[in-house]
Amino acid sequence: MAIVGVPGWIGESAVNETGQRWMDAAMRAVHVSVPGWMSSMAGQSKEIYLSIGANHNYDRNSLINWMRAQGGAPVVITITGDLVSNSTGNACLEFPSDLPNAYIQLIINSGVTVYGRGGNGSTNSSAGGNGGTAIHNAAGTKLRIRNNGAIAGGGGGGGAASLKNSYPTNGSCGGGGGRPFGVGGKIGSDSILSGSNASLTDAGTGGTTFQYGAGNGGNVGAGGGRGWGKNVYTSEGGAAGAAVTGNAPNWQNVGTIYGSRV
């Protein structure tokens, strides 16, 4: 609950909000300038903290709902383990324009990566799936990012290859999945012709024969490969996912980025 506005019993309200009876300590707790007037604390709140550990199927709504529940309070979110979006269609982390928080501090710890999900490999004339976005920001500079780790768009899925434009099961190769966790294009139960699934650390490889083969999945921030071979039909690889889309945040530390960013 925020400190009351003017006019109001700011001193008493500041003690209740911050737990600090000395006004200079209370002012520091709500991040206003010291020395200064007590009225500068009107409407301010203490920061509320959240740590998010490793999750390879993360739902962006978990964080969005938590931020909304804090009302106007500023929030500090620390990512302590690798996060991967649950879908290429959803950013791993999303910050809508109508969040009520005074500001949002996002800290990505050293050795930790926020990933968009990798695209799936193709089995036909359609391109491999596009990689997903790591962070979508519609909150502008209200979002402050201190990236001590990495932010990575998902890799695109690999394109397919076939002897015929109908892409029959007995004459086609499936594309590899994009990193991370893109699903390889499956050609029946044939493990050689099928593309392999991507893992957290590696892109999937395309299925192959001696004469032709499917494209490999893309690494983070990279598109998938096209199918290859002479006198065969091939499809394109999927596009790379972006690291950060939407509006530019307040970059306190850009850190390591794979893919495009604003």
From Swiss-Prot:
UniProt short sequence motif GRM 9, positions renumbered to this chain: 222-227
Residue span of motif GRM 2: 126-133
Motif range (GRM 10): 229-242
Motif (GRM 1) on chain: 116-123
Keyword Hydrolase appears in the UniProt entry: no
GRM 7 (motif): residue ranges: 201-211
Signal peptide (residue range): none
Motif (GRM 3): 153-163
Record-annotated site: Interaction with the fiber protein p37: 9, 22, 37
InterPro entries: Gp38_N, Receptor-recog_Gp38
Subcellular location: Virion
Keywords: Host-virus interaction, Viral attachment to host cell, Viral tail fiber protein, Viral tail protein, Virion, Virus entry into host cell
Principal location class: virion
Motif window: GRM 4: 166-179
Domain of life: Viruses
Note: This phage use outer membrane proteins ompF and TTR as receptors.
Family: Belongs to the receptor-recognizing protein gp38 family.
Role of this protein: Receptor binding protein (RBP) that is at the tip of the long tail fibers and serves as the phage recognition site for the attachment host receptor. Probably uses the host receptors OmpF and TTR.
UniProt-recorded name of the protein: Receptor-recognizing protein gp38
Biological source species: Enterobacteria phage T2 (Bacteriophage T2)
